[in-house]
Each structure stands twice: as C-alpha cells, then as structure tokens.
C-alpha cells in the first residue's frame, strides 16, 4: 500500500548513500521521495510523471507496449483475435490496456480484455497477452486439459521476460526490457555516480508460444 511504502521510505531516509527505488505508482511521483537528495536517487521502472530533477531508468508501458506488439505482428497475424489478461489488482500501469486496444484497432484485430484466466479458456486461433507469470502457468495447464497446443492452436505473449519462460512448454514469447542492461546501469549509478534519464526499449523475445 501507499502507506507502507511511505513508512519504509521515511525509515530509510538518511541511512544510505544511494537509493534505488521503484516509485509506488506509474502516474504520480510519491511525495515522500522529495525528501531524498536528487543526486542520491535513481528511479526505476515506473515513471509517467515529471522527474526531470532525478536520474531514472524506466519502462514505457504505453508506446513501448504498442511498438513491442508491432514487432511481433507477423506472428500475431496467425490469430484472428487478441485477448489481454490483466488482473484487476495487479500493480501494472492501467494505461497499457488503452495501448493494447489501440494496437488491435489500428491493425484490424478482434480483441477482449479479461481480469483473470478464470474468466477465459484457451481457444483456437486466439493469441493471449498475459501480464502475470502465474496466470501463464495456469493457462498452459488449462490448455493441456483441452488438448490444445500453445504456439499452434493458440498463442501466448508474456510481459517482462523471466528465465523460466525459456523452458515453460516450448518457450514463452515475451515483450521485455533488457534486465541485464538495467542492472549494469544501476551499478554505474551506484559505483561511479553515473546519471541516467532514459526509457529502455521494449524488446521481443520470440519463442515457441507464438
């Protein structure tokens, strides 16, 4: 919660030489962070707010998502419909849904958005953009009970790559930033006082699920 975030931040202020923090919300800068020296603070991931006075390495959950899906369009064209699974209470920018919808409209896809994998079953000729890793595992289990093959009967596109996506089923295609690049830049900020103000590009990791 915002209250817990504020409490943790308040207790840590003045105790460290550098602060590497993911802001609580993507849309609004947390006021508690204004108490930290801007030269000591690096903002990560969320950042759809004015942050010109700070170093940041962020994801673009809006246009980045759109462009990432565009890079996968040849694979997505195999499917007649795109479905986004976006859990109601997931701490992921809600604006991603609007860019998903806009992509589908711009490129002629039928589309739907569900709040959980319990609300939908794998269907033939449908590709699913699934944000949460646990939902992907649940969805693969469902598909096996229905004798549907991921990457052939239906598709899956994940958000944010993980090592497990390389080995789940025949590999899960993911839209992701380069986490190694982010880690290297964090180290530069901490060790060498390197300043950053950038959004990392959204990349496509194409695997068997699409």
List each model region and its residues:
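Flexible loop/turn connectors
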Residues: 122-127, 134-210
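Structural motif
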Residues: 1-13, 66-67, 95-98, 102-128, ...
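Hydrophobic alpha-helical segments within soluble ligand-binding/sensing domains
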Residues: 47-83, 136, 175-195
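Short, conserved loop/helix-junction motifs that constitute active-site signature segments
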Residues: 33-38, 76, 146-151
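A generic structural motif
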Residues: 1, 43-46, 107-119, 150-161
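An alpha-beta-alpha
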Residues: 66-107, 198-210
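Alpha-helical recognition/docking segments in bacterial nutrient-uptake
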Residues: 1-67, 127-128, 134
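A generic secondary-structure signal
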Residues: 11, 71-75, 102-103, 142-146, ...
